[in-house]
């Protein structure tokens, strides 16, 4: 991994590492850069954690990885960052002639990424003709570079894992592949235990919840605030709870103040279990996602997901109107008024919330840690 920061990818890595260790696997985690303290503290002391000499190709990194592979007799490497070529380049050199299998995982929609989205937003915002042309050229350069990088990673991996079957065609096209026989489909597991949770609709509060990074490029939380601004006056007994932090928090707080919203609460980074147990609705309005781990985690606690359909994997998870609500993707942009109407339907209808919440719990069981780890073990056996 490049980093081991506070994020879904890192949490999934931690949960899988702990479970694999309990099953007797010899697990080691390696990061190019130092980990976030909060994430490192989540790991048991019996799981070795190594930090390399920064994210670059160097003899020192190659030697460090080679020593780790030999010391711990590693047979399989899971590359949790399946986009950049550099980790695979360093790993291949470190492996030498050792028969070590590589499984690369891409944790997002393979048809886009943060760099491309930034340029797309810039294209929308600039007025000058030549500025748009230059930005479009920049976009195509990024697009080609990303595709070539993913192509390299795929070629030198024994398996390339995507989170949804719906991503296969876009991945094949994006990475300039003629075949995709090494692609493996496996979603992420629910990382927060909910087996002891007993659903009681009467214990659910009138709370709408967001859990995750406060990040504008991907998460677009301002959409939730805009929707809430149209709801708050009509639902004074409801609250919007935002659990998470990030670079855009100050701007988001400023927006809440500007709109004079009274029932919006910022909780910062917290263990979301308590919030899942009591919340009624989860909103996720990202511009792109890979899987949206918070969706299935919330569902396991009977929280109804209302999710913007900007990524195809959400249709694998949610049956619209049965165990959650999907807000259809709109090429012209997120439809705040439509989202508001859908939220009103839920907030006004307790019976509907009760039914959808119970159905969501049933759906979430497909993504249990036990089920996903079992699939991983079957993959290991085939390598």
Model-found features: residue ranges?
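Short hydrophobic beta-strand element within catalytic cores of glycosyltransferases
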Residues: 304-308, 318
